[in-house]
């Protein structure tokens, strides 16, 4: 059995995010990673046409638009909002979406790595 997956890893978006108003005052970097799963071989595998593919340039543009226009206190909320918009945009094209949102520089002393929240959804 063949499985098909498109991955976009660590797309940086500057967003208004944070628990306090002070934290949300200046845009902060978050990293968005995404895996799209396909039930069948994507048509673009045979045709080599962008029009038959999931255009990842359009997808990252959507991620940036949604993330920058939806200020959130928590990465959990941002992940849910992004997942819903991506699922709607790709209706009928994918069977599963895995999404991870990472706050690149959380304001916690001595925390040296990003904090992440992941969410996955099977798409009917």
Curated annotation (Swiss-Prot):
It catalyses: 7,8-dihydroneopterin = 6-hydroxymethyl-7,8-dihydropterin + glycolaldehyde. Keywords: Folate biosynthesis, Lyase. Pathway: Cofactor biosynthesis; tetrahydrofolate biosynthesis; 2-amino-4-hydroxy-6-hydroxymethyl-7,8-dihydropteridine diphosphate from 7,8-dihydroneopterin triphosphate: step 3/4. The active site is at 103 (proton donor/acceptor). One of its GO terms (biological process) is folic acid biosynthetic process. It is an enzyme of class 4 (lyase). Its EC number is 4.1.2.25. It comes from the Bacteria. It holds the Pfam family FolB. SMART domains: FolB. One of its GO terms (cellular component) is cytoplasm. NCBIfam families: folB, folB_dom. Belongs to the DHNA family. PANTHER family: DIHYDRONEOPTERIN ALDOLASE 1-RELATED. Catalyzes the conversion of 7,8-dihydroneopterin to 6-hydroxymethyl-7,8-dihydropterin. This is Probable dihydroneopterin aldolase. It comes from Chlamydia trachomatis serovar D (strain ATCC VR-885 / DSM 19411 / UW-3/Cx). The gene is folB.
